[in-house]
């Protein structure tokens, strides 16, 4: 009994086999990555017309353009006034850029593109519709006798549109007129759908794709003699039943069964060995003979050998029986391998003409069962028979094999001795050329051993003939015969010597060792901030962790370490480039630092006064406290000293303190601000980024914005003032990596400061002509009573708000501020910026009679005086006041009362 076996256990490969008992007679294999393209319908565009070939090249959406000959162009594309009797040039039929509907008639092979046709054919279960071929109708040649006569009568009853034709397939034999009409209606509807899709889009694109292997198997292979269809996959079983019903073959639904045996389906029917024979060059015959199958670009050659065959009584009978046995196996191998094109068979010599005719008749008889069209010739006087077979799809070898990289498809390679002598002659030829400095030959190890041992004298003679030239032979383990490389180096070219494989290995090991050591040096131990738990005792724990960090590391290396914590490569690159830009624009060279910065001093960023004193709260003593627990022990930070753009607002850095000033001199840790409250509002703020610095300190990266400052320009000069006290605002501000990202959102706390009556009285006695800056960005002169009254009113309102809101009395958080990248920076010392009365007289001693705007002498900057401790970046106001002698305009300073802190 004949069966159809479908193996679908492996999703990468689907196999369909037709067996007669346990003999395999047809096979179809489809791989997941190489679906069949034949019979696919595309809308293509003419890219080039070649009159010499009478053909056109069509772009249909694949890598290689398709080949469309003139004979495969339908008359629908011909001009209306053409005459059939006259010859037509393809240039008069098609034009470049014209869109056509084409179907693939032959698959791509090697470097050749697919063969195309405009004569579309739509295959169904019982018939094939050809919508633009009016003269191609007929009945399958396999249908004979009464069935053929009956089908001719049924063809006249089918209603077919004009300029269309159809072919009744072998499966249509014995079918009723209703079945044929149903199949025809499906094909007509399919053609209408193709035309609608083709008009909807421009070329190139795929219109219709040929069905998968299961649908093709049911459509092409199902015949009445198939008694059973076995499938070893339940999912494919359900799919097969749906397809077979849709194809109009309900008589086969009950024949579909699920195979659930423990032994694989193909192994159970013992056909795996027969399938493997389709991949081999040599196929054994039952009598002991063999056939050899060799495929080339031009044709497929099949040779028959008797070998140890003893099937006959004499030589003639043995040759005849072996050839007769080979004919059956050849026809089977042609179907299994799906070989197409020209095929030449070399039979064993037979002197009897009757034997030759018997072989030809047997081959024609077997070919009738083949789906492909086959044309068979006669055995020539040389014992060769020529035949051609229709190429239905890519052969099994083309879809499953690849060219051998060593022999490049020839099947043989040159022996070592012959190859060595050929390389030696090539070296000698290259050495004889003029201006040759060196000839290098990279060869396999076997060839190198032969040349350096057996042909040592010949190589030495070539070097002598070079007159100072060199001949270098390098063995390569990676290279196998017959591959080699011979190159010629001229005297003017670079002379980088080719090294042996061992040297390359050593060099790679050395470089990898050095890279590891460099990485170890660069990637020092970094404190993981994510593992910290900030609670009441967090400050002590942070101090303990700081002791394990290496000290005095460069700021650039610190940034690299922070970046190395992030595993995202893209984030690293973006942050690195932006941070480099930040350092380049913010940190200046040591030369500029020496000119404009006092030695042995630490600088902080200064912000001007926000509120004035209130008479009602004279006895209260509150100070602004933000960064009371952390300090930055940075000395001589170089910052770029240039005129900064302050068109929008002044953004200041401040509160970088020494630890000694925090713990000893400055009374920053007050009863008003508790440590837990500070940690809650600052440390646990998710907008603040904590960075652990190896210089034994920790600081926050925050930027503050003030709306109090009036738009001003800075000058490239610094002045020295004595140490005096004054009520000021200290905002938490530290460098941030997030500055490199362009924008930062920050929260920062503030508190209020009031001084005593005694301090107010001392402030009123100050001689310096100074003025105050209000919240509305206006400068208020001390004689402007209305302005001072307005400031006091605003201050009183603010004090009243804080007093009513007890929770906000200690710490008041400002709103979130969006921080852009370009900002203004000023540097000042972070000590109490206040004036003493005694310092005013000393300042007058150092003042000249003529006003100056810049200190030009470096010696003045290097003077050491006990009373001078600060660097001040002066800000020039748009309102011009009377300049004091020896300094900038004093209108840039606060007019608020100043006094000494107790």
Curated annotation (Swiss-Prot):
Its EC number is 3.1.26.12. It is a peripheral membrane protein. It comes from the Bacteria. Endoribonuclease that plays a central role in RNA processing and decay. Required for the maturation of 5S and 16S rRNAs and the majority of tRNAs. Also involved in the degradation of most mRNAs. SUPFAM superfamilies: Nucleic acid-binding proteins (SSF50249). Component of the RNA degradosome, which is a multiprotein complex involved in RNA processing and mRNA degradation. Within the RNA degradosome, RNase E assembles into a homotetramer formed by a dimer of dimers. It catalyses: Endonucleolytic cleavage of single-stranded RNA in A- and U-rich regions. One of its GO terms (cellular component) is cytoplasm. This is Ribonuclease E. It is found in: Cytoplasm; Cell inner membrane. Keywords: Cell inner membrane, Cell membrane, Cytoplasm, Endonuclease, Hydrolase, Magnesium, Membrane, Metal-binding, Nuclease, RNA-binding, rRNA processing, rRNA-binding, tRNA processing, tRNA-binding, Zinc. It is an enzyme of class 3 (hydrolase). GO terms for molecular function: magnesium ion binding; ribonuclease E activity; RNA endonuclease activity; rRNA binding; tRNA binding; zinc ion binding. Mg(2+) binds at residues 303, 346. Pfam families: RNase_E_G (PF10150), RNase_E_G_Thio (PF20833), S1 (PF00575). Residues 889-902 have a biased composition (Polar residues). Residues 39-119 form the S1 motif domain. Residues 881-902 are annotated as: Disordered. HAMAP family: RNase_E. InterPro entries: NA-bd_OB-fold (IPR012340), RNA-bd_AU-1/RNase_E/G (IPR019307), RNase_E (IPR028878), RNase_E/G (IPR004659), RNase_E_G_thioredoxin-like (IPR048583), S1_domain (IPR003029). Zn(2+) binds at residues 404, 407. Its main location: cytoplasm.
